[in-house]
Amino acid sequence: MPNASEHSFPFPILIGDIGGTNARFALLTDAYGEPKQLAPIRTGDFATIEEAMQKGILDKTSVQPRSAILAVAGPIKGDEIPLTNAGWVIRPKDMLAGLGLEDVLVINDFEAQALAIAAPADQDVVQIGGGAVRPFHSRVVLGPGTGLGVAGLVYAQHTWIPVPGEGGHVDIGPRTERDFRIWPFLEPIEGRMAGEQILCGRGIMNLYRAVCAANGEEAVLADQAAVTTSALSGADAAAVETVSLFATYLGRVAGDMALIFMARGGVFLAGGISQKILPALTKPEFRAAFEDKAPHSALMRTIPTFAVIHPMAALSGLAAFARTPRDFGVAMEGRRWRR
């Protein structure tokens, strides 16, 4: 755990959520003000993140940030951090040398999502089903997106500690008769079926094609957006079943994560897919699958589940951390660079 002297960053602080398609930034001028949202930057529009930050942010504001706290999708090892789903490579030493920064911290993207669920505002979440939050108990966040992100959040020594991992790659298997009809048509990864093969954007298409194949039908919808839109409107029966099954399987995995972390503080669904298919998630299938964990179904009924509807949840989490770093046990060794 970093000591207290390590838990401070000079203001102004630039916070950033660096995704595969878009990079979203905000400026925090002090510990008391709200972050100033900046226009999103498409990662494909700039060759490097340094160029994007210079031309897309610094050249357009009179505020010179002294620190940067960035959340990225990718392993954080060494002085060069390649993004999982984009061409950029994060080089913190180059940021210190070329952008006038004094302090750079890089964390996992789902650590930021976990930070955001420490104290979410009521208007930023929608409860799905029953259960009640137990304060200061463990929490879990799952986010179907480009992949399936998972992180825990545990409270110890008066500190919220995010626990990132690769929970999206746990095994997932068939349980019902319908599952067994669909499963042979799902595309595995290296011979096995991981949660991320179904519970993400491309996973929706994997599941849709398998549903169509099990029905002996042609898959006519071309992409994830078409499937979810057709499902919510009821225009395509295979799409409706796909999204219903997606909600069921997400409920199963979310329930597993709740048991692993004993997440009496709640299980939170983050990301754009969860927001888009919220009408499907509020139907009985998700919550029924979540609670169907014999011999612990009674326990599961007490654990609340939520959809995060804040449009910039990761930035909200980063801002909370930047304001009061001592409230969070974010590991910094090997992930922080200073001049």
UniProtKB/Swiss-Prot annotation:
Record: residues binding ATP: 16-21
Keywords carried by this UniProt record: ATP-binding, Cytoplasm, Glycolysis, Kinase, Nucleotide-binding, Transferase
Major place of residence: cytoplasm
BP GO terms, sorted: glycolytic process
Matches recorded under InterPro entries: ATPase_NBD (IPR043129), Bacterial_glucokinase (IPR050201), Glucokinase (IPR003836)
A GO term from the CC aspect: cytosol
E.C. code: 2.7.1.2
Reaction(s) catalysed (UniProt annotation): D-glucose + ATP = D-glucose 6-phosphate + ADP + H(+)
Subcellular location: Cytoplasm
Gene Ontology molecular-function annotations: ATP binding; D-glucose binding; glucokinase activity
SUPFAM superfamilies: Actin-like ATPase domain
Similarity annotation: Belongs to the bacterial glucokinase family.
Name this polypeptide is given: Glucokinase
